[in-house]
Amino acid sequence: MNNTIFNVLNKIKNTNISLNKADVYHILEHIINKDYQWIISNLDHKLTKKQIYKIDQILDLLKQNYPLAYILKSKYFYSNIFFVNKDVLIPRNESELIIDHVSEFVKNNNDLLIVDLCTGSGCLGISCALLNDQNKVILTDISYKSLKVANKNIKKFNLINTSCLNGNFIDVLIKNNLKANLIICNPPYIDINDQNIDKNVIDFEPSIALFAPNKGLYFYEILIKNIDKIVDTNKNFLIVLEFGWLQKDSIEQLLINNCLKYKWEFKKDYNDYWRNLIIKNF
């Protein structure tokens, strides 16, 4: 086989593995240490036998349903590459919508305290820090292993005003007397009894980042009940949460039952599913 980039791309695409275009190019970027633009401009470039061998190893693991992000130990999120491993949830494309919803608020303010609860890899909070490095960003998680990954990403992007804090959900803010101006969070939201979950998610991703009690509503209920304890209500504040596509009605009922006094709205994702809750006072 002529091992040009062009032929290798076709080889990967023709394997019986479900990969999107971005995944295919991410594999090549990882193996030859070149970016997308270089790759598509050098399709006649020949790969070495060692590089071909590494690609074959990756394809073998993918055939066993091993997640690509864990194989490469990296995942694109909001146009940046983040380090990930099996200790953190793999960042999803739909989670980028959280950054879309907060970007204007982050860019237009230089003295915010931004808190990323249940941070995992840190991709949400770090993406905010990269939008405006004048704000202070705190990444929190109950898992020390997750924070080790998040801290590695902080160092990767040379962020001075971003730090990690270990603790349980909002308790870590209350304990440290922290009141945020912006809270972003993609908490565990899968019902413990939910049987309709992809097998590779169950088999490989950390359960602590997936499942929550009370039909997956546990973290939303706690946050909604305690907003005044964790945000600075004397200034403009913004909270953006991600939730499961079938949870909108249940979360809306939580808001109503708790007589939330702040503005709130729901937003859909790329596939027209309800995905985000936005709470704010402006």
UniProtKB/Swiss-Prot annotation:
What is this enzyme's EC?
2.1.1.297
Could you list this entry's UniProt keywords, alphabetically sorted. Methyltransferase, S-adenosyl-L-methionine, Transferase
Q: Name one GO molecular function term.
A: protein-(glutamine-N5) methyltransferase activity
Name of protein: Release factor glutamine methyltransferase
Which parts of the sequence bind substrate?
N186, P187, P188, Y189
Source organism per entry reads: Mycoplasma mycoides subsp. mycoides SC (strain CCUG 32753 / NCTC 10114 / PG1)
Which family does the entry's similarity section mention? Belongs to the protein N5-glutamine methyltransferase family. PrmC subfamily.
The protein's enzyme class: transferase
Cross-referenced SUPFAM superfamilies: S-adenosyl-L-methionine-dependent methyltransferases
Q: Name one Pfam family in it.
A: PrmC_N
Task: State the InterPro entries in the record.
Answer: DNA_methylase_N6_adenine_CS, HemK-like, N5-glutamine_MTase, PrmC_N, RF_methyltr_PrmC, SAM-dependent_MTases_sf, Small_mtfrase_dom
- Listed binding positions for S-adenosyl-L-methionine are D141, F169, N186
Summary of the function given for this chain in its UniProt record: Methylates the class 1 translation termination release factors RF1/PrfA and RF2/PrfB on the glutamine residue of the universally conserved GGQ motif.
A biological process (GO) of this protein is: methylation
**Reactions mediated catalytically:** L-glutaminyl-[peptide chain release factor] + S-adenosyl-L-methionine = N(5)-methyl-L-glutaminyl-[peptide chain release factor] + S-adenosyl-L-homocysteine + H(+)
Q: Which CDD domains match?
A: AdoMet_MTases (cd02440)
